């Protein structure tokens, strides 16, 4: 029983480490996208945002992806593009 608990704790620690890495990657991408958007002229920025949103709409996944997941992705993309980090 102790071995099982120890193994579960090790797996939990590994998952937590993977989660931290993913959070760091997402934050890094947010910083890069924000910096790129700030360097663009307003008209170019709006054109890029519209293009990305249109492509995202065209690539909307089929029934194999839960609607909630698809909507969450769209919300995060819209938030990143329309309300970038400070």
Swiss-Prot record:
One Pfam family it belongs to: Anti-adapt_IraP
GO cellular component, one term: cytoplasm
InterPro entries: SigmaS_Anti-adapt_IraP
Coiled-coil annotated residue ranges, if any: 1-42
Cell compartment(s), UniProt: Cytoplasm
Main location, first listed in the record: cytoplasm
UniProt record, GO biological process: cellular response to starvation
Keyword rRNA-binding (UniProt): no
Keywords attached to this entry: Coiled coil, Cytoplasm, Stress response
Domain of life of the native organism: Bacteria
NCBIfam families: PRK10244.1 (NF007598)
Family of the protein in this entry: Belongs to the IraP family.
Function: Inhibits RpoS proteolysis by regulating RssB activity, thereby increasing the stability of the sigma stress factor RpoS especially during phosphate starvation, but also in stationary phase and during nitrogen starvation. Its effect on RpoS stability is due to its interaction with RssB, which probably blocks the interaction of RssB with RpoS, and the consequent delivery of the RssB-RpoS complex to the ClpXP protein degradation pathway.
The protein's assembly and partners: Interacts with RssB.
Record protein name field: Anti-adapter protein IraP
Lineage: Bacteria, Pseudomonadati, Pseudomonadota, Gammaproteobacteria, Enterobacterales
Gene symbol of the encoding locus: iraP
